[in-house]
């Protein structure tokens, strides 16, 4: 066959738009507009090239994966009430998109993300089944890469999804350590006072690049 970077970019763009990666996340605060990759399909397909997304946009992306294609806008609110407790506005999730992707494809993606977690010493130690993907984003050779993690839990019936980014954080392992604490807090896996101590947790942290 003949390789076509142009055709490859068209296909990549098609699927990125299906995931609404060309839209802001919906949060009620100022948010930088996403930038989808526009050149070099080989590098773009692994998240490099000129693509740029906020952490909240990555959070909506992994939420869509966790829900097998159901896409929602993010919000900072649950509801607005008056002084008497009457609900003035409800911020219950509204479906904004539904990807037409086969269930077997979602299962394959979920299984791959589960495999990442089971092979990770930190994530596999949790008493809740987690699925996720680690990554490092290289921006400048003169500075450390950004550490990233996206994931959801529980694996079989997802309830929460998250994205963690540590700017110039060296390693995705450092982002995983933050994610572990979030999962532990949500599912009461560790004492709250230990998790919210007000001091930095240096366990499992590294300045060695990974991924």
Predicted features by range, described:
Residues 1-165, 210-211:
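Beta-lactam-recognizing serine transpeptidase/beta-lactamase-like catalytic domain environment
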Residues 54-60, 174-181:
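Short amphipathic alpha-helical face segments that pack within enzyme cores
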Residues 74, 171-174:
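Extracytoplasmic/secreted cell-surface and envelope-processing proteins
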Residues 87-89, 94, 178-211:
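Short, gly/Ser/Thr-rich active-site loops of penicillin-recognizing serine hydrolases
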């Amino acid at each position: 066959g003949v390789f076509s970077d142009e055709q490859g970019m068209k296909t990549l763009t098609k699927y990125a738009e299906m995931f609404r990666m060309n839209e802001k996340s919906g949060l009620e605060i100022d948010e930088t507009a996403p930038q989808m990759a526009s050149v070099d399909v080989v590098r773009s397909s692994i998240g490099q090239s000129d693509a740029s997304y906020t952490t909240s946009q990555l959070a909506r992306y992994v939420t869509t994966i966790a829900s097998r294609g159901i896409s929602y806008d993010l919000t900072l609110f649950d509801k607005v009430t008056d002084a008497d407790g009457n609900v003035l506005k409800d911020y219950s999730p509204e479906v904004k998109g539904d990807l037409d992707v086969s269930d077997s494809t979602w299962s394959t993606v979920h299984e791959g993300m589960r495999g990442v977690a089971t092979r990770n010493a930190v994530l596999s130690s949790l008493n809740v089944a987690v699925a996720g993907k680690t990554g490092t984003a290289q921006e400048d050779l003169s500075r450390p890469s950004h550490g990233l993690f996206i994931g959801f839990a529980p694996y079989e019936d997802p309830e929460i999804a998250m994205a963690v980014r540590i700017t110039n954080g060296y390693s995705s392992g450092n982002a995983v350590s933050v994610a572990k604490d979030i999962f532990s807090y949500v599912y009461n896996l560790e004492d709250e006072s230990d998790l919210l101590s007000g001091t930095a947790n240096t366990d499992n942290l590294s300045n060695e690049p990974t991924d």
